[in-house]
């Protein structure tokens, strides 16, 4: 990454220059997605990295690059990074906040997929749990938007995984004009009304068939879409 910024945070005897072009690698100190018993055996989701975390990572990598045979003094470098960070102005820190924002979007998309074991697992769960006679779940405005735009993204990026496509859709949704969002909100409201009507009829039929006095929503299996999870944080 060409940051266009350099700073000396080490003693003059070494004076390595920070932020020269190099590729970021996964942060080994980043927090990991906490797996539940259902998640066992799935690849963990790497946690979000803070702006300061990206800054410190660059300090370490640049020092290691310039002095590969030198034992890294963690305490000393951490101290120098902290001192330098406190003196940096907002313009100098902005790039690290941008990296953190992108990483947060990556994390959100990966957690959404991991929560359901990936796209294949979601399809299997849908086949296994959905009552074929139950009404189709109401879709969100973001989901309707995703239905329209996903083919374009997949055509332009055929190698992208489902998480990457979801992340791009989230970015696009944030930039959609309010007039366009209102159109999709109207679609979502109409679908919500349709679902409510169908669910009332469905419950009535189930009561007749089973002789139950009541039928709880907990007894009805719904299909949950990744886009619905993303839209909770995006809308």
UniProtKB/Swiss-Prot annotation:
A Pfam match: HMG_box
Residue ranges of the region described as Disordered: 1-47
Entry keyword set: DNA-binding, Nucleus, Repeat
GO cellular component, one term: nucleus
Keyword ATP-binding set for record: no
Any GO molecular function: transcription cis-regulatory region binding
Residues annotated to bind DNA: 47-117, 135-203
Gene3D superfamilies per UniProt: High mobility group box domain (1.10.30.10)
Domain of life per record: Eukaryota
DNA-binding found in the keyword field: yes
Biased composition (Polar residues): 1-34
Main localisation: nucleus
Compartment(s): Nucleus
GO biological process, one term: gonad development
InterPro entries noted in UniProt: HMG_box_dom (IPR009071), HMG_box_dom_sf (IPR036910), HMGB (IPR050342)
SMART domains found in the cross-reference section: HMG
The family this protein is said to belong to: Belongs to the HMGB family.
Protein name stated in the entry: High mobility group protein 1.2
The species this protein was found in: Caenorhabditis elegans
